């Protein structure tokens, strides 16, 4: 699924990416390899900003990222990722690794014109739809259905309510 999501993001060297849901840090590391490949000039590097709502997961992901040598290309913070990460917005790409009830407006607002977001959307039951959200250079939003998926629910202000 990580590969499918990364391919759909159409990542390029130099992109600034917001990842909502850090998990172990694995997905952020794979994105960093594409947008900030070692061996390329640092001035061309992009950066991944990850927001994880569960403190223990965020701390583990940060430790994994640093130990794997990605600390200069990935920043992990603990907070409500459903609201995005306004400090570093706007983003070329946004990837959400938990299913939202709808596409959160703050994430769309923090996406650059010409940007792409990949997000699972649907109920908390086992199946959702992977959506590719594209913000045109005119600011208009287009969505493409990428198929059925099963993700944990997105929590936070713009996530599922329990």
What are these model-predicted stretches?
Residues 10-138:
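Conserved nucleotide-cofactor-binding alpha/beta core module
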Residues 122-162:
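Active-site capping/gating segments
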Residues 1-7:
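A glycine-rich, Thr/Ser-enriched phosphate-binding loop motif common to dinucleotide/cofactor-binding enzymes
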């Amino acid at each position: 699924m990580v590969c499918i999501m990364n391919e759909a993001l159409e990542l390029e060297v130099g992109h600034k990416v917001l990842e909502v849901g850090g998990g172990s840090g694995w997905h952020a590391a794979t994105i960093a390899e594409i947008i900030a490949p070692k061996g390329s000039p640092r001035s061309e590097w992009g950066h991944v900003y990850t927001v994880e709502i569960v403190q223990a997961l965020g701390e583990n992901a940060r430790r994994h990222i640093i130990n794997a040598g990605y600390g200069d290309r990935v920043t992990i913070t603990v907070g409500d990722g459903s609201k995005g990460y306004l400090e570093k917005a706007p983003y070329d790409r946004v990837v959400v690794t938990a299913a939202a009830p709808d596409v959160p407006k703050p994430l769309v607002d923090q996406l650059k014109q010409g940007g792409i977001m990949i997000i699972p959307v649907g109920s908390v039951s086992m199946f959702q739809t992977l959506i590719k959200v594209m913000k045109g250079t005119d600011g208009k939003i287009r969505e493409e259905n990428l198929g059925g998926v099963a993700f944990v629910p997105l929590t936070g202000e713009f996530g599922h309510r329990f």
